[in-house]
Amino acid sequence: MTTIEVIEVGLDTLEIINEPLEEQRYGFLLSPAFGKEGVNLRIRFELLLPINKKQYLFCKTITGFFLENFNQDYFKSEIETISGLVQTSMANARLLIMQKQQKLNYVQMKYFDNKYFQDEIKLQIKELGL
């Protein structure tokens, strides 16, 4: 059985941008560091949420996980697990927004099923040369 630990949750950027944004946007970047015991996986998550017709909220977070006994081959085969961690990173971004900008708790955010992220994860794994 694999143990997954959350080892880092941090807010990098939280700004209100005075430009219109039609709909929610997001992006993430996987940064795995493989070791003898497993992999440290940092996920940078960027979230852009419309506040009103003239402004949006820009949030960048970092969530770190330690995935015990993961090597490169196992990491590549566990797309569903990684998708769940990206989904967790997205939820962490929302929680950090709620903590730091309580007056903006009304801002709606769409959550996605973890399968939604799988194509991008596969692409990033390929780009990492794994």
Question: Could you tell me what each predicted segment is?
Answer:
Residues 1-88, 102-130:
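N-terminal intrinsically disordered, cationic/polar leader segments
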